């Protein structure tokens, strides 16, 4: 699965779909370049929590659905909701639904646009696992909406169900942190949200506490960001949305130029770009 995703991004997604919007192209870059960098995180969580045939999983902010696909291949029944990026959700449908371009990977998969309420189905048993894999802890305010989202999702699960949150590791363990500072430098310095900030030790625990969840373990996973070339690295990082404020404050060309310069120290002699990173995850339970 991962090698297929790695190879697909070598041709720019815009070449086969000239009418695609910028949002669609960025979503495609996310799905084909950037999202696979988090595969070690998804794998570690699924392995530790023994995701399988008995798992009824609700993915919050499921994006283009790679984590759901990986859970489904382990036998889980998966449901994903996405309220921020319909373009990514469209790609998740390609991956997961029977009539999608990727084939029938998961017969028991549901995908909806919206928040947790969109996942309500009284004909099905409650969920026993909730995931929020979009990492927090690198931009000011990036966790503000997560606790309320988890509060709304918790009633859809059995009492004591597993909940997984993800975040960036310590800045000194995340090489990409230095690159993300470009976004802050180019964006409006007066912005209170959307600027880079170092992750803090208890970011995930604080969110869990605000959401009324009971922490039940944590872990760290190495998630290196490796790209075939500089163009892929720039496109992949831009697809995260972390540079949107910088693009709005300046322009896309300037951001690409500054980002390329920031990535240059991580360019290898063979043309690949490599940055070591560590991500955290917190396992909690509903009360």
List PLM regions with ranges:
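Class I SAM-dependent methyltransferase SAM/SAH-binding core
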Residues: 58, 64-120
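Residues lining the SAM
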Residues: 132-136, 166
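Conserved Class I S-adenosyl-L-methionine
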Residues: 3-5, 23, 27, 38, ...
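Conserved catalytic/acceptor-binding region of the Class I
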Residues: 154, 160-226, 244
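Conserved class I S-adenosyl-L-methionine
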Residues: 2-55, 85-88, 98-99, 105
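A short acidic, Gly/Pro-enriched loop at the edge of an enzyme's catalytic core
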Residues: 117-130
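A short, conserved alpha-helix within the catalytic core of class I
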Residues: 138-152
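Class I S-adenosylmethionine-dependent transferase superfamily signal
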Residues: 71, 152-153
